[in-house]
Amino acid sequence: MTATHLLSPADILWKILEDYGYDAEPIFLKEGIDHEMISKPGMRISHAKAESLWNKVAGLIVDPCFGLRGSKFWHPSHFNALGYAWLASSTLREALVRASRYAHIVGEDRETRLEDTPEGLCITLSDSLTLPPLMDLAMSILISACRLNYGEDLNPVAVYFIHSKPHCAKEYYSYFNAPVMFNTGSDKLILSASAVDKHLPVGNPQLAKINDQYIIRYLA
């Protein structure tokens, strides 16, 4: 079976292109994608098409840090019911467990691994995100989503990237506000145990359960 990806997150890439002054529509149309398709809830595309689109965009935008701009344009609805289940989670750990359990709603080749370490909870992102800007996008949205639930004062203990250090590395240091390492063995970030286990007033177990049930039906 061919792996597929949720199409709605492509809206983030569309907006990044526009932010750099590009007309996104013809770029997407070359891949057979229009904005009406992106706006259709639950619409999916093949892994090959998603990869081709990302490679085209990476070839157009000169700035190697463009993936970090995803944090400006993402919305929980881009990730279907997982985004809303995230918002309703009572702790960051609960939200991250959901993101790990239901990662396939975003991409059937996606995997998020969680591990408790002496430094805190380590979140390792999927090996399938081999294109550096795509990993940057995923990592920037992850910490943005954590800050959305927890508060803007949340900073990781440390952030690690497999890809090499770009000339714009200061943008990583500024955005994550934490030690950022490049040329490492895995793409991961660490959050303190006190942060991930803090009870959050935004939590709503009933709403979280409703969205969990929707995700389970969607993935069935």
List PLM regions with ranges.
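Short hinge/gating elements
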Residues: 79-85, 126-129, 196-197, 215-217
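Conserved short hydrophobic interaction patches
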Residues: 102, 141-145, 149, 214-217
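Extended mid-to-C-terminal alpha-helical interaction segments
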Residues: 174-220
